[in-house]
């Protein structure tokens, strides 16, 4: 599981002054730990950029029971770190990408059917939408991109850019 945790969390203002957004607590638990607990046995690749040193120290101290490695993207934008993370996967290996601030419901399950999936929001507004097989930077409550992507292999992302925002067609 790849967790995109590189943003500054600017909309959280003072909460991220001394820590990355993924360590902001929700009900006394850092957001990233919801993913750790949901997928206890998974191997996590965490893409970090802001306050990486704080994240590393915190996870080594309080997350040692989970299997993770932290990478810092060498180029700009969301896609740079994702591209670097998937380069370590086998060509036919399925994987999931999720944003660090996504807390999945207890009954969420990964689909068992093969294929690629995009998490779509039906009840809260997202900054990006998924319309006609494309990402568009238009807020939506009905077709908002919720920050969860499941791929059966690396093929769907083979032509992505080296830097910038995640923009794939499915």
Question: Where are the language model's segments positioned?
Answer:
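N-terminal nucleotide-binding beta1-loop-alpha1 segment
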Residues: 1-17
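Conserved N-terminal catalytic core of the sugar/cofactor nucleotidyltransferase
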Residues: 3, 11, 25, 29-99, ...
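Alpha-helix/helix-capping structural signal
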Residues: 7, 50, 154-155
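Short secondary-structure boundary/capping segments
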Residues: 14-15, 86-87, 110, 140-141
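Residues that form generic nucleotide/phosphate-binding pockets
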Residues: 58, 159, 169
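Conserved core of the sugar-phosphate nucleotidyltransferase
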Residues: 103-164
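A short, conserved alpha-helix in the catalytic core of glycosyltransferases
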Residues: 164-170
């Amino acid at each position: 599981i790849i967790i995109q945790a590189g943003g500054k969390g600017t909309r959280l203002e003072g909460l991220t002054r001394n820590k990355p957004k993924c360590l902001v607590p929700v009900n006394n638990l850092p957001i990233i730990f919801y993913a750790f607990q949901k997928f206890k046995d998974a191997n996590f690749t965490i893409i970090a950029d802001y306050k990486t040193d704080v994240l590393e120290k915190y996870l080594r101290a309080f997350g040692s029971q989970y299997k993770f490695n932290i990478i810092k993207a060498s180029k700009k934008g969301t896609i740079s770190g994702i591209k670097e993370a998937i380069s370590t996967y086998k060509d036919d290996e399925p994987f999931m990408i999720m944003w660090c601030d996504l807390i999945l419901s207890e009954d969420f399950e990964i689909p068992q059917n093969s294929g690629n999936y995009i998490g779509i929001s039906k009840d809260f507004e997202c900054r990006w939408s998924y319309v006609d097989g494309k990402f568009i930077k238009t807020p939506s409550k009905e077709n908002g991109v919720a920050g969860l992507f499941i791929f059966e292999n690396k093929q769907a992302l083979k032509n992505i850019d080296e830097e910038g925002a995640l923009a794939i067609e499915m």
